[in-house]
Amino acid sequence: MPKRTLQGVVVSDKQAKTVVVRVDRRFTHPLYKKTIRRSKNYHAHDENNEFKPGDMVWIEESKPISKLKRWTVVRGEQKKTA
């Protein structure tokens, strides 16, 4: 079974070797047929502390690393600065 991969935006990098990633999803409400946005935060392992808030990253499921971390950062794109 392949590992799940999610795309999200780094919200926080205040913990050592950990980033908090916000993953947004959109779905249609079954009764009202309105498109709804929901988001969820995931704690992900960032070995080299290379990602900062605002960066787009892809996270992949992994074995439990700590109490909250079950995801690792696979790759990412640095936020463009002007």
Curated annotation (Swiss-Prot):
Database matches in CDD domains: Ribosomal_uS17
InterPro entries membership: NA-bd_OB-fold, Ribosomal_uS17, Ribosomal_uS17_bact/chlr, Ribosomal_uS17_CS
Alphabetical GO biological process terms: translation
CC terms in the record's Gene Ontology section: cytosolic small ribosomal subunit
Pfam family, any one: Ribosomal_S17
Transmembrane segments: none
Top-level taxonomic group: Bacteria
UniProtKB keywords: Ribonucleoprotein, Ribosomal protein, RNA-binding, rRNA-binding
Gene3D superfamilies: Nucleic acid-binding proteins (2.40.50.140)
GO molecular function, one term: structural constituent of ribosome
Sections of the chain in a coiled coil: none
PROSITE patterns named in the record: RIBOSOMAL_S17
Similarity comment text for this entry: Belongs to the universal ribosomal protein uS17 family.
Known role: One of the primary rRNA binding proteins, it binds specifically to the 5'-end of 16S ribosomal RNA.
PANTHER family to which the protein is assigned, alphabetical: 40S RIBOSOMAL PROTEIN S11 FAMILY MEMBER, SMALL RIBOSOMAL SUBUNIT PROTEIN US17M
Quaternary context: Part of the 30S ribosomal subunit.
Record's protein name: Small ribosomal subunit protein uS17
Native source organism of the sequence: Nitrobacter hamburgensis (strain DSM 10229 / NCIMB 13809 / X14)
